[in-house]
């Protein structure tokens, strides 16, 4: 299986994890095993558990991690606590999440994530459950608008949702290019003339809805944080503002000492921070990485201990 994946922000991730060769580590998003392999190579008596909900990724990661102290499990990272408990692992010394859609999922047109090639409108990372076509052909205009606005930050959400409802009344919307053309027809001409494809926010929003990505991230962060050993590190790579905002707010809450109202002059809560921020500001790709890996352009890495 062709599965190209250049790991984003690899060295900053390895530095952030502060790997102990005897430690236990979790990669919640195995993908093409780019990060997983480099983590596992640095372990001696330690162990790596790699998770991914995509069966294609699991097959590739299993092959690429052969001979290394690593185990791959097909599951969404929101189930990390359960998986670790079943494996008899009480805590991990570090965990990594590389969020969003993988290069393989984008490059494989048949998966239906890309608006650059015609394919069935699928977008399921796990290849199970309702597809993107199911959503766009069944949800009412109000719900479609909410998804496009909340998950895509799409300024023309109402107009696009209206075009989708009108188009599907004539024939089902079953392919990626069908949807991309509907979006293009719904936005003002000035939007269509811009360098970025006008469908990009719609595709992001529907993908997030199909895969419940923000719910999974919210639950997964809590689950993984609770599995960290004292001094354990959590590294999270985000690719859009919705993910990054969620991660930033979680990290800040965990690192916060006082929870008293801001107008209260003296602390009475006796709060103790659960963690400390290793990165006050997110780490982004340097010029060398940007030149060799286009996917790294929007990547932001945050690290917590």
Name each region found by the language model.
Residues 1-305:
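S-adenosyl-L-methionine-dependent methyltransferase catalytic core, i.e., the SAM/SAH-binding region
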């Amino acid at each position: 299986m062709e599965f190209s994946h250049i790991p984003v922000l690899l060295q900053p991730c390895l530095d952030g994890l502060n790997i102990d060769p005897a430690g236990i580590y979790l990669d919640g998003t195995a993908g093409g095993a780019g990060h997983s392999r480099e983590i596992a190579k640095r372990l001696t008596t330690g162990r790596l558990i790699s998770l991914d909900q995509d069966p294609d990724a699991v097959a590739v990661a299993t092959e690429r991690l052969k001979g290394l102290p690593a185990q791959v499990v097909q599951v969404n990272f929101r189930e990390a606590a359960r998986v670790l408990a079943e494996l008899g692992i009480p805590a991990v010394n570090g965990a990594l999440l590389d969020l969003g859609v993988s290069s393989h999922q984008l490059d494989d047109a048949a998966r239906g994530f890309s608006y650059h090639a015609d394919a069935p409108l699928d977008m399921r990372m796990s290849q199970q459950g309702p597809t993107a076509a199911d959503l766009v052909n069944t949800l009412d205009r109000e719900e479609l608008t909410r998804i496009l606005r909340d998950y895509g930050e799409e300024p023309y959400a109402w107009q696009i949702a209206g075009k989708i409802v009108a188009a599907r009344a004539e024939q089902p919307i079953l392919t990626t290019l069908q949807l991309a053309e509907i979006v293009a027809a719904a936005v003002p001409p000035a939007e269509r003339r811009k360098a970025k494809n006008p469908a990009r926010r719609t595709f992001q929003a529907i993908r997030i809805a199909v895969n419940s990505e923000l719910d999974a991230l919210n639950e997964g962060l809590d689950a993984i944080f609770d599995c960290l050993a004292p001094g354990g590190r959590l590294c999270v790579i985000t690719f859009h503002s919705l993910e990054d905002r969620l991660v930033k707010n979680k990290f800040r809450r965990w690192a916060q000492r006082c929870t008293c109202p801001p107008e209260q002059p003296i602390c009475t809560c006796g709060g103790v921070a659960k963690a400390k921020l290793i990165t006050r500001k997110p780490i982004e790709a340097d010029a060398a990485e940007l030149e060799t890996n286009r996917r790294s352009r929007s990547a932001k890495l945050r690290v917590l201990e």
